[in-house]
């Protein structure tokens, strides 16, 4: 059994802070679950270009407001507490936060822990 608390994550290699988001990575590839799970905070009044070409992601908003824009279609979806979106087609998108958004994110394949978005908006596969 795996049991972790936020205090166990803060200030470790599983606490990744960037200009537009901070991610507390609770479950990673090394945990052997077949997916990774994170509590990610999207910083207020930010826009992040993302393209998970190597991963599938499901995201559940537990706090805050924003939107996701799918680049290829121009579709824009409102995000607020209680919203789930799943990037099941490797969609290129913009994630915008009107207020600080707290998100529970699940990735498959799992992340290893220190990934940040590359210039094309993606995370590398483990071992790349």
For each predicted feature, which ranges?
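Short acidic-glycine-tyrosine-enriched beta hairpin
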Residues: 73-90
């Amino acid at each position: 059994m795996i049991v972790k608390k936020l205090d166990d994550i803060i200030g470790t290699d599983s606490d990744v802070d960037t200009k537009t988001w901070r991610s507390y990575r609770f479950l990673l590839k090394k945990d052997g679950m077949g997916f990774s799970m994170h509590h990610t905070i999207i910083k207020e009044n930010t826009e992040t270009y993302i393209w998970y070409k190597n991963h599938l992601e499901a995201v559940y908003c537990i706090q805050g407001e924003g939107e996701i824009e799918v680049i290829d279609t121009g579709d824009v979806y409102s995000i607020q507490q209680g919203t789930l979106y799943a990037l099941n087609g490797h969609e290129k998108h913009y994630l915008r936060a009107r207020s600080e958004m707290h998100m529970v994110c699940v990735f498959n394949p799992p992340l290893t822990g220190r990934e940040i978005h590359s210039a094309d908006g993606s995370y590398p596969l483990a071992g790349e």
